[in-house]
Amino acid sequence: MYDINEDEITEEWEVCAMNDNHKQISRVPMPKTNRAFHTLFVDIIVMTQAITGEQYALHAVCPVIKFHALAAVDSKAVIPDMKAMIQQIEQTLKTHIEVIHTDGESSLNGLAFRNWCRDRHTLLHITVPDTPEQNGPSERAGGLITKRARHKIQGANLPVVLWPFAMKASIFTIN
């Protein structure tokens, strides 16, 4: 009655099976610390080009005391800004950051930065690329800051190109 081709059925079944696959995420718990600035979570947020030329926001958060730091940068070459941010946090708050936790961002895990971390006895923990679930505190904090900055811009009826100022104001009110 029906003319069925086995190749077509097999292909449809493969498509159905592929659609039902779930993303497997490592659920290894992150080590908890009680000391502020023991671990600093870092992420790069891609934005639209700002009025001052920046296109990326380098964001760092301490999950223990929920302290945020941000630098607006014009390229993904953020190592000098990252070093300056870490040194400013350590000098201002008289502490030593022991672990820097980043996602697999290529601009944050280069050899020069790894050597800098090793020389200052700081562990650089890099998660798998394109897996934001493994960098949870930084991703959540980045989403919060982006949301608050967007509300500030829309509430004041300002152009979107002023996002660096809105993000810095959001961090100021959060801290």
Region locations from a protein language model:
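Retroviral integrase
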Residues: 2-147
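Charged alpha-helix within mobile-element recombinases
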Residues: 138-175
